[in-house]
Amino acid sequence: MIYLFSLSLSAIFLPWIISNKLYRSISIINAFIITFFALNVLNNHFFSLWHNISLNFGIDNLSAPLIILSTWLIPISLLASINSTNPYTPNSQRTFISTIFFILLALLLTFSALELSLFFIAFESTLLPTLVLITRWGAQKERFQAGIYFIFYTLAGSLPLLIAIISLYNINSSLILPSIYLSTNILSFSSATLSIWWIFCFIAFIIKMPIYGFHLWLPKAHVEAPIAGSMILAAILLKLGGYGLARTTLIFFFISANYISFPLITFCIWGALITSIICIRQTDLKALIAYSSVGHMSMVAAGIFTLSPWGINGATTLMIAHGLISSSLFCLANILYERNNTRTLAITRGFKLITPLLSLWWIITCVTNLGLPPTPNLIGELLIISSVINWNISSFIIITSATVFGAIYSLLIFQNTNSSTFPSFISNIQPISSSEHILLFLHIFPLILIIINPSILLLT
């Protein structure tokens, strides 16, 4: 892991010491080298217990897939943003690349931190570079409003989390996760106090995911962010919330199991259903994809709150699968936007007549998003649905309805973008380049590997 930290840190400064002709290419190559080291270092570390790197850092089966996902998608996002950053000056492009690598370093620190104060610092350090991505390289003037929403919601959840961490230290005299899991000091407090304490812990994570009701910042941020920002935000940054939720839920296992699970799981599955219905009524392609992320992450939260092995396994699988598919959807949306300069679904249609091979990528991505067998999305959703139904059989109708509406809007995305006649007022459509096909293949290839060997994502 020290190699990953060192390479990510050096990559932040690398663009500034290379000539104007080579800095972008070398940065992308360096990103793929980081990916190679991540795959190599983490290959033998899929243990049910922590693999300690040091006293404050370690990886296990929950953090390792998310680290690999982060290092896999960073070079892809850099490749996808080449066209959108071409109009900017070389120094602006260097700043863009450095910002991306700073986010990667913060993600690696967050997913490998064993100590909660270090986890909090790394978790919050993703805020500023993400805000810079949205407000500096966004296309429309509304990006500033999106940035305000993003920072307001995130900071509103950060303060309760900080208070909870400080309180935990005063009680346990340690913030190292393995020692907290084994500690019995928490049992001396009343159930009401512990319930409030746990709410303070998880509110930052459900805002970061986000689940329905705490999601207003996400569609604005996705719509206004540049392509790299949308891909990283949907694929990785939202998973910070799920990861933190899984970690803190294990600390307060007995509290959440006895007192808080019922309202939280009910709220999450209703949120998944409502956002799936909202997606059907969307007219903006990027907003539709953003709302679909809210629905999927609401299901992830429901799976974690069941506190069952099936639920947590399903949540992990769905987070990884959603990370790849949501990034692919934003990449496809950007390919269309670069050719017709609009995200409106009423205008973005008929592309199968112009770019038939692109339609193949659309159908693969959409059917994977809806959970067609044997895709990892199906595995994750089935595990979550099974755990939720086992928790309460009356939740069957709600959670299955959410998946049905999810399938409907996924098919609507494909139908609206590829069917009907191509708009006559749009001309000079550029063919899909080889680099764009490679980008889309790099999203689908890991899913194929997971289909072949799904056990790599299972924690137990």
Curated annotation (Swiss-Prot):
Its main location: mitochondrion. GO terms for biological process: ATP synthesis coupled electron transport; electron transport coupled proton transport. It catalyses: a ubiquinone + NADH + 5 H(+)(in) = a ubiquinol + NAD(+) + 4 H(+)(out). It comes from the Eukaryota. Its EC number is 7.1.1.2. Keywords: Electron transport, Membrane, Mitochondrion, NAD, Respiratory chain, Translocase, Transmembrane, Transmembrane helix, Transport, Ubiquinone. It is an enzyme of class 7 (translocase). The chain crosses the membrane at residues 26-46, 62-82, 100-120, 146-166, 194-214, 225-245, 260-280, 300-320, 353-373, 393-413, 438-458. It holds the Pfam family Oxidored_q5_N. Core subunit of the mitochondrial membrane respiratory chain NADH dehydrogenase (Complex I) that is believed to belong to the minimal assembly required for catalysis. Complex I functions in the transfer of electrons from NADH to the respiratory chain. The immediate electron acceptor for the enzyme is believed to be ubiquinone. This is NADH-ubiquinone oxidoreductase chain 4. It comes from Pisaster ochraceus.
